[in-house]
Every structure is written in structure tokens, then in C-alpha cells.
């Protein structure tokens, strides 16, 4: 399949070009002390506001997973809905939202996961994933990996097979990739487009 934006063939072994990475990185904004003091927040809204940047992002995500036979894309609340929904259409896969408790109207499965202080929970509608379906977990950012790991646990709870994890941004210094590898195994590749080291 040829990308109308980049003019390249989708190849799941290909890596993003340096030009594409520079372009996307230029559309990510650092916001100091948000949502609390000491946090350097990666704001994706400039990327979303630029049609070319958004096209490139979706092209690169689809390029990586087009050969993985994905049946279901799970998007994690809330920015995972943006990328996951669009990516599911490109991969001809179903889209399933994972949300915080009390946001989904029908019966749900729920998992709890650890935060730095305390715990949080995620929910998915029961019956969203058929047993044996190959599931791709999508979110905007990989930090510690707890949220994505919980979404994968929900998918497995319904009998799904985790085919991989896809992120726009990864904070390499927070260890999320290692956590996902530990819990999901090497059979579930972790792909992030833009990487940041500490202090970037």
C-alpha cells in the first residue's frame, strides 16, 4: 500500500526517516510543571493541528503494523482514541475504547494497576474482543508503561492475543518498554515514533 503523504510503500520492517522524525518532534510542545510541579508535559496538540504531521504519524504507525494481521485496535483514554480510531481504519480493524471507570454505558471488565502513589483502574465493554483476536494497544505516549500494560491485561482477559503496542512518543528514561516486555513478552513488539531522553 502506498502512502499518499510520504510516497513510500508500507513495510513493517521500515524505520521512520530522519526528516519525518524531525518534523514530528518540531510539532511536540514541552509544557513545564503540568499537570503538577516538576513534570515536563509533552503536548501533542500542535501535532494534531498540523494535517501533514498527523498524516505522517498515522502513516508511520500503519506502516509498522500493516503486516501484523491486527484484528482489533484498543485505544486508551483519551488521546489513544485519536490515534487508535484513525489507525484502526487504516488497518481495517475494529476499534475498542478503554476508559476510566464509570465512562462506558454497558457491562464492563475492569483491571486495576499501580501508579507512583496509589492505584487506578481501566474498563472495557464485555465482549469487545473475540477469543483469539490479535489486538494492538495504542496510546499517545509511553512513560512507565502501567496504563498500556493494564489495557493489554483487559484484552487478554477477554481472550485476545496482544499483537503489539504503538505510541507516538516514548520517554525512554521511565522504563515503560521494559515493563511491557516483561508482562507481554517479546512476541508483542513495542513501537514508538519519537523518543525523548531525560531533560529533552
UniProtKB/Swiss-Prot annotation:
Pathway: Purine metabolism; AMP biosynthesis via salvage pathway; AMP from adenine: step 1/1. It catalyses: AMP + diphosphate = 5-phospho-alpha-D-ribose 1-diphosphate + adenine. It is an enzyme of class 2 (transferase). Keywords: Cytoplasm, Glycosyltransferase, Purine salvage, Transferase. The keyword Transferase applies. Its main location: cytoplasm. One of its GO terms (molecular function) is adenine binding. Its EC number is 2.4.2.7. GO terms for biological process: adenine salvage; AMP salvage; purine ribonucleoside salvage. GO terms for cellular component: cytoplasm. It comes from the Bacteria. It is found in: Cytoplasm. SUPFAM superfamilies: PRTase-like. NCBIfam families: apt (TIGR01090), PRK02304.1-3 (NF002634), PRK02304.1-5 (NF002636). Homodimer. PANTHER family: ADENINE PHOSPHORIBOSYLTRANSFERASE (PTHR32315:SF3). Catalyzes a salvage reaction resulting in the formation of AMP, that is energically less costly than de novo synthesis. Belongs to the purine/pyrimidine phosphoribosyltransferase family. This is Adenine phosphoribosyltransferase. It comes from Sorangium cellulosum (strain So ce56). The gene is apt.
Amino acid at each position: 500500500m502506498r502512502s499518499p503523504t510520504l510516497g513510500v510503500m508500507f513495510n513493517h520492517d521500515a524505520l521512520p526517516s530522519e526528516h519525518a522524525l524531525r518534523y514530528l518532534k518540531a510539532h511536540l510542545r514541552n509544557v513545564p510543571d503540568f499537570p503538577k510541579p516538576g513534570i515536563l508535559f509533552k503536548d501533542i496538540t500542535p501535532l494534531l493541528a498540523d494535517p501533514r504531521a498527523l498524516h505522517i504519524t498515522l502513516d508511520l504507525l500503519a506502516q509498522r503494523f500493516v503486516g501484523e494481521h491486527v484484528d482489533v485496535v484498543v485505544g486508551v483514554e483519551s488521546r489513544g482514541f485519536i490515534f487508535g480510531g484513525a489507525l484502526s481504519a487504516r488497518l481495517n480493524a475494529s476499534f475498542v475504547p478503554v476508559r476510566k471507570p464509570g465512562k462506558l454505558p454497558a457491562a464492563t471488565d475492569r483491571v486495576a494497576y499501580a501508579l507512583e502513589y496509589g492505584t487506578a483502574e481501566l474498563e472495557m465493554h464485555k465482549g469487545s474482543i473475540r477469543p483469539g483476536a490479535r489486538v494492538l494497544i495504542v496510546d499517545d505516549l509511553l512513560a512507565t508503561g502501567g496504563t498500556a500494560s493494564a489495557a493489554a491485561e483487559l484484552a487478554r482477559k477477554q481472550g485476545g492475543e496482544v499483537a503489539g503496542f504503538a505510541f507516538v512518543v516514548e520517554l525512554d528514561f521511565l522504563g515503560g518498554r521494559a515493563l511491557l516486555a516483561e508482562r507481554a513478552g517479546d512476541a508483542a513488539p513495542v513501537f514508538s515514533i519519537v523518543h525523548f531522553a531525560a531533560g529533552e
